[in-house]
Regions:
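Short amphipathic alpha-helix adjacent to the substrate-entry channel of hydrolases
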Residues: 3, 11-29, 216
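Glycine-rich "HGGG/HGxG" loop immediately N-terminal to the catalytic nucleophile
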Residues: 11, 35-45, 239-240
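Alpha/beta-hydrolase active-site loop
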Residues: 45-64
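Alpha/beta-hydrolase fold nucleophile elbow
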Residues: 64-77
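A catalytic-pocket lid/entrance helix-loop region that shapes and gates access to the active site
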Residues: 73, 80-143, 223-261
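Short beta-strand/loop motif that positions the catalytic acidic residue
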Residues: 194, 200-202
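Conserved alpha/beta-hydrolase "acid-adjacent" motif
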Residues: 207-213
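Glycine/threonine-rich phosphate-binding loop and adjacent beta-strand/alpha-helix elements that clamp
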Residues: 255, 268-509
Length: 509
């Protein structure tokens, strides 16, 4: 494992301590990456990791304590370090990269054309604090730490990064346009690495899920030996409780046991244990199921309203027939709609959002009580016609369940779309992709779709002037009026990791 947080932590925030693996007969090596912890050199982010990783693997394979086979594990940054290398012959014999992706723009820094705001600033400042510690800059470290403890980092974090850690890779991300691929890095493991035995561990409430699914799809495409587990977890919570929600006893993490079985098979030659190709946790029925990420369940709802779906949370409808009506609502930057839970929240996970849906700047559409069980498996997608009176707006979407036996509104997943330019003034079709999920609604439950023009601080508040803006609402932010026409609106389900043949079919090939 190679990580940028100090090797003594050893990712024990989510995994068992390396001593547990050592007691099972493994030599476990945890390294500081270049310019972090006690390692020399300058930290440059991911672009240093291919050559440094090769050097580490070569050294380890030649160590007298190594039997010649090497496995790697780790999540987030430590996940990507396993996948990068320039010499194919040095590739690990087995990999277990969790919660990471290959595309800096789409898998690490933004969604729907908008920067991850709170998440990116929080992580960037953590990296900056390590830079301050290494140069013994106590005042700068104190300022960063105080901003994180108080929440002030959401408004001054960008300035703190620029002042105290100007080469920070996350600062560079926040200075780039997430609507354009220009200037962003993408990493591509060689075919040999993708064909190695790979164990992919993901979470429904983790921001890097889409990156992990893309990695699974690429490995499958070239015949890789890949197992995929998707639990109900967030980035740092891998047990039954994620935030304030209890996912049941089956959600208690078996990650270390899974990894041990995986490495025993591929590094020590133990007999293989029967494993499902993909195991996913159903967030409502609270059990593990075998599913194919290349397929999705069937879902088709349209949106209908007589114009009061913002003023009343119970007026808008999700209907199996055609959509009808229109809704006008106003985004006031002085009181932007909060983002809550989901995969982009600092409070990640399933959350109650009934109070948010009661706001008059949130547009709600609810189904009738279901007559039969409804499984949601895949990536929800909303398509509708929408215009604004400014050259910029955000569309922030939440999908929730209204359980039959309570007054709760339990948010299941979210998505965001940022639009900039004069085309925002035209009534045009807009499409939002939400976080993938597996959740089975019971007969009598209802499904709800909620629309807003902000999700602060998960994403920066759109200033409405055609620019991305500085984060929080400021003196130049505009009031934005949004108008949606619901004819031809559609809430559908798409595969979360389409098989190559399905992708070609959609392209008409």
């Amino acid at each position: 494992m190679r990580q940028p947080y100090g090797c003594r932590i050893a990712s024990s925030t989510v995994y068992a301590h390396p001593a547990w693996y050592a007691n099972k007969g493994y030599l476990v090596l945890v390294l500081d990456v270049r310019g972090r912890g006690d390692s020399g050199g300058q930290f440059l982010g991911f672009k240093q990791e291919a050559t440094d990783g090769d050097d580490s693997l070569l050294w380890l394979r030649n160590d007298h304590r190594c039997n010649g086979k090497v496995g790697c594990y780790g999540f987030s940054y430590q996940g990507l370090t396993q996948l990068l290398g320039e010499q194919p012959e040095l590739a690990p014999d087995a990999l277990a990269p969790a919660m990471c992706g290959l595309d800096e723009r789409q898998h690490w820094a933004s969604e729907g054309g908008s920067h991850w705001w709170a998440l990116s600033l929080g992580w960037g400042l953590q990296l900056a604090a390590e830079s301050c510690r290494r140069r013994n800059d106590q005042p700068a470290w104190d300022a960063i730490r105080a901003s994180l403890l108080s929440g002030e980092f959401l408004t001054i974090g960008l300035a703190l990064l620029a002042e105290h850690d100007p080469t920070n890779p996350v600062l560079k991300w926040l200075q780039r346009d997430p609507l354009s691929s220009t200037g962003w890095s993408q990493y591509q493991p060689g075919p040999l690495r993708l064909q190695r035995p790979m164990l992919l561990l993901q979470g429904w409430s983790d921001p890097y899920l889409r990156g992990g699914l893309d990695l699974w799809r690429q490995a499958q495409q070239i015949g890789g030996n890949t197992r995929l587990y998707i639990g109900p977890w967030s980035h740092l919570a891998w047990d039954r409780r994620v935030g304030g929600h209890d996912h049941g006893s089956q959600a208690c993490s078996n990650v270390d046991q899974w990894q041990l079985q995986f490495f025993d098979q591929h590094l020590r030659g133990h007999d293989p244990i029967a494993q499902l190709h993909c195991k996913a946790y159903d967030q409502l029925s609270q059990n593990w199921r075998e599913r194919d990420p290349g397929r999705s369940s069937e879902l088709l709802f349209a949106l209908r309203s007589n114009g009061l779906a913002a003023a009343r949370s119970d007026e808008g409808e999700l209907v199996p027939a055609s959509g009808a009506g229109q809704v006008v609502w106003v985004h006031d930057p002085w009181r932007p709609v909060p983002g809550r839970g989901g995969h982009l929240g600092l409070d990640a996970g399933l959350v109650e959002r009934g109070d948010l849906d009661s706001r008059a700047d949130v547009v709600c559409f609810s189904s009738a009580p279901l007559k039969e069980e409804l499984e949601l498996w895949g990536q929800p997608q909303l398509s509708l016609k929408l215009a604004a009176d400014r050259p910029g707006f955000d569309l922030c979407v939440s999908l929730s369940v209204l359980p039959r036996d309570s007054a709760r509104v339990l948010q299941l997943c979210t998505g965001v779309l940022r639009q900039l330019g004069e085309h925002c003034r035209s009534l045009s079709r807009r499409t939002v992709q939400l976080q993938p999920l597996l959740a089975t609604l019971r007969p009598g439950d209802r499904l709800r779709l909620s629309l807003a023009a902000a999700a602060w601080p998960q994403v920066a508040v759109n200033p409405g002037d055609g620019s991305h803006g500085p984060g929080a609402s400021g003196i130049g932010h505009q009031v934005i009026t949004l108008h949606t026409v619901l004819e031809d609106s559609a809430l559908t389900m798409q595969p979360m990791a389409p098989h190559p043949a399905a992708e070609l079919g959609r392209k008409g090939v």
